[in-house]
Amino acid sequence: YLQRIRKADGVMFSGGDQSRLTRIFGNTEFLEIIKQRYWNEEFVVAGTSAGAMAMSEIMIKGGSSTEALLRGSVKIGHGFGLISGVIIDSHFVIRGRFGRLMEAVVTHPKTVGIGLGEDTGVLITEGHMIETIGSNLVVIVDGHGVDYTNINDIEPGKPVAIAGMMMHVLAKGNVFNINSRVFFKNMDSLEKKELQSETQR
């Protein structure tokens, strides 16, 4: 199977249990080949549901939507580490996982949370450019501007307070830059802005 992954044009991780995926593939030569090819070649890595959640360095292992925003209700672990600076959650809108992703992000405030709706995904290029695809929504939860939270001062099970968290809702074609935290209407508007920046230099 190592030879197959060396020759393949891409790989897709299915849903199920993200912790099981990381237990099976974490710290293996198989995963290392995938990571090196993803970073250095035009190699496509895809995931659905749990497979998408496992892509990031910081990964949600579990935690119910009803208990979210009570300190400690969201369980965090290590993902595949293909993408840094993000936390990904799936079935986001239909299962009401807003609180779950907010707690995960406020615990790691330098990250950007990506909540994937049903029948919707994101194309991530250059490790930081997100383009929404599909018929539903992607919700971005940005903890970079949080100016107050009590999460480090309260006991487990107590309500979490947050001030200054930012949220963006992306539909098909919308673009978000993870590094700069900037929203673009589409790739064309991004390219126009980059061209203007080059012209001004």
Give, region by region, the residue ranges found by the protein language model.
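Glycine-rich, phosphate-binding/catalytic loops in enzymes
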Residues: N27-L31, G62-S64
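C-terminal and late-domain segments of enzyme folds
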Residues: M59-R201
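Short, active-site-adjacent cap segments at secondary-structure transitions
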Residues: Q18-S19, A52-M55, G121-L123
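N-terminal beta1-alpha1 cap of cysteine-dependent amidohydrolase-like domains
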Residues: Y1-S14, V175-I178
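Catalytic-core regions built around general acid/base machinery
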Residues: R4-K7, E29-E42
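Catalytic nucleophile loop
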Residues: S14-G15, Y38-M59
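Glycine/threonine-rich flexible loop motifs
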Residues: Q18-T28
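Glycine/Thr-rich phosphate-binding loops of Rossmann-like dinucleotide-binding domains
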Residues: L21-T22, S56, G63
